């Protein structure tokens, strides 16, 4: 049976403590599909912002230069609005997608806005991103691993497919979010088990196993809920067959630099 299935999933992080304030925005995101299919749709989130977000234009293409790009709409409107505290699905577009297909999403906004739903990677072979503070600009992607490659709002890409994949979750702290560990595994699964597995990345840099983020510094607040809390809440709604976790260093280190974390440990 043909159905919508997640072909790419990177769970957005709450950056409301350190929002990105932009007069204008353009961002280019490279994703790699775990599944083959004939149609595509995007999930865009604004869970953590204080106001609605407006994107004037969103496009999808198979090349980074965005030649032969297709316009993405939501409710058949070119201007896409993401209500505060919500997520939306775009309308589907026809696109012939193969396993391992590289897809580029180009999003533009001329509105002065704060972006709080954020995700990033350092390893760029399968997922990459770049953004600029101008609406009329196509950002260039960099392949260097020394700097963070971040993007806003895009959390999931689904394809209309006959495949019925199992889900593998990778989660924990920065080691899992950065992609150095997960990218080889993802590439292996695409090659050896095409159309059978989709990897879900729900890691958060700075995350701890037991305690939620301390609040004595804005950067600490971005570390989010404890992994135990997040796994119970399961915001993604997926039921992974297997979850791979790498976490623990921040449980040891944060109490050394944060008074709030030190009190949490003592309690």
Regions found by a protein language model. Name each.
Residues 61, 164-266:
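Conserved SGNH/GDSL esterase-like catalytic core that processes O-acyl groups on lipids
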């Amino acid at each position: 049976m043909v159905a919508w299935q997640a072909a790419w999933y990177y769970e957005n992080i709450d950056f409301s403590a350190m929002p990105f304030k932009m007069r204008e925005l353009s961002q280019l995101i490279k994703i790699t599909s775990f599944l083959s299919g004939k149609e595509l749709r995007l999930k865009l989130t604004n869970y953590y912002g204080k106001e609605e977000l407006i994107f004037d234009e969103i496009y999808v293409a198979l090349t980074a230069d965005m030649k032969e790009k297709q316009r993405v709409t939501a409710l058949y409107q070119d201007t896409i609005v993401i209500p505060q505290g919500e997520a939306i699905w775009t309308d589907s577009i026809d696109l012939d997608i193969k396993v391992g297909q590289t897809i580029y999403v180009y999003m533009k906004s001329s509105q002065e806005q704060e972006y709080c739903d954020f995700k990033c990677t350092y390893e760029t072979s399968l997922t990459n991103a770049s953004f600029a503070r101008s609406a009329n600009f196509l950002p260039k992607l960099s392949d260097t691993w020394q700097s963070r490659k971040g993007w806003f709002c895009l959390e999931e890409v689904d394809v209309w497919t006959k495949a019925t994949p199992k889900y593998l979750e990778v989660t924990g702290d920065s080691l899992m979010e950065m992609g150095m560990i997960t990218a080889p595994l993802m590439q292996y699964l695409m090659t050896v088990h095409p159309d059978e597995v989709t990897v879900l990345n729900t890691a958060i840099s700075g995350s701890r196993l037991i305690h939620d983020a301390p609040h004595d510094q804005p950067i600490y607040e971005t570390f989010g809920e404890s992994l135990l809390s997040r796994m119970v809440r399961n915001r993604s709604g997926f039921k992974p067959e297997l979850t791979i976790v790498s976490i623990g260093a921040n449980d040891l280190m944060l109490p050394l630099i944060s008074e709030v974390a030190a009190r949490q440990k003592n309690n």
